[in-house]
């Protein structure tokens, strides 16, 4: 079977950018079992409740749901097991420093295949308060209204 080229999106955490202020992103590899890869190739995964932690110098992805492979047998995986993320040692050390000093969190933004390998886009993020979310919505609405007005002015319907 030929390897896929390019990037194929499997799952995206759409609430992440609403609930968190993303400060930095990292592309990480992920350690998976065979049935997990097959399940992902079917496009099944959920990142909604997912987060990452650093334990003993290793980064672990927790609470991400990859359903059991339907054609799998007794070798099937546990859907919500912890999965190891692959980062360079220097990146892990920088992450540990930022998490400890600032109280930041690691949140998965998307899960995808890149040149046949499963990757996770991991974000270093700070939680938003309710008033921050309202401000962001107000900014989006104002920007949308400006774009509408510009479009009407261009078309001469002003």
Swiss-Prot record:
For this UniProt record, the keywords arranged alphabetically read as follows:
Cytoplasm, RNA-binding
Q: Tell me, what is an example of a GO biological process annotation in this record?
A: trans-translation
Location relative to the cell:
Cytoplasm
- Predominant place of localization: cytoplasm
According to the UniProt record, one GO cellular component term is: cytosol
Cross-referenced InterPro entries, in alphabetical order? Answer: SmpB, SsrA-bd_prot, SsrA-bd_prot_CS
CDD domains per the UniProt record, alphabetical:
SmpB
Q: Check the record and name the Pfam families matching this protein.
A: SmpB (PF01668)
Q: Which molecular function terms from Gene Ontology are attached?
A: RNA binding
Write down the superkingdom of origin: Bacteria
Known function: Required for rescue of stalled ribosomes mediated by trans-translation. Binds to transfer-messenger RNA (tmRNA), required for stable association of tmRNA with ribosomes. tmRNA and SmpB together mimic tRNA shape, replacing the anticodon stem-loop with SmpB. tmRNA is encoded by the ssrA gene; the 2 termini fold to resemble tRNA(Ala) and it encodes a 'tag peptide', a short internal open reading frame. During trans-translation Ala-aminoacylated tmRNA acts like a tRNA, entering the A-site of stalled ribosomes, displacing the stalled mRNA.
Task: Spell out the NCBIfam families in the cross-references.
Answer: PRK05422.1, smpB
The family line of this record is: Belongs to the SmpB family.
What's the name of the protein?
Answer: SsrA-binding protein
Question: What is the species of this protein?
Answer: Saccharopolyspora erythraea (strain ATCC 11635 / DSM 40517 / JCM 4748 / NBRC 13426 / NCIMB 8594 / NRRL 2338)
**What does the record give as the organism's lineage?**
Bacteria, Bacillati, Actinomycetota, Actinomycetes, Pseudonocardiales
């Amino acid at each position: 079977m030929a390897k896929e080229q390019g990037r194929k999106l499997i799952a995206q955490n759409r609430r992440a950018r609403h609930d968190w202020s993303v400060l930095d992103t990292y592309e990480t590899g992920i350690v998976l079992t065979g049935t997990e890869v097959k399940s992902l190739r079917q496009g099944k995964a959920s990142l909604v409740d997912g987060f990452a932690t650093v334990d003993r110098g290793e980064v672990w992805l927790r609470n991400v749901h990859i359903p059991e492979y339907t054609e799998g047998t007794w070798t099937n995986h546990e859907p919500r097991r912890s999965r190891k993320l692959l980062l360079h040692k220097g990146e892990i050390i920088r992450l540990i420093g930022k998490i400890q000093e600032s109280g930041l969190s690691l949140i998965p933004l998307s899960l995808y295949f890149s040149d046949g390998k499963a990757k996770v886009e991991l974000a270093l993020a700070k939680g938003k308060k309710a008033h921050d979310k309202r401000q962001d919505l107000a900014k989006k609405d104002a920007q949308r209204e400006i774009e509408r007005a510009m479009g009407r002015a261009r078309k001469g319907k002003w």
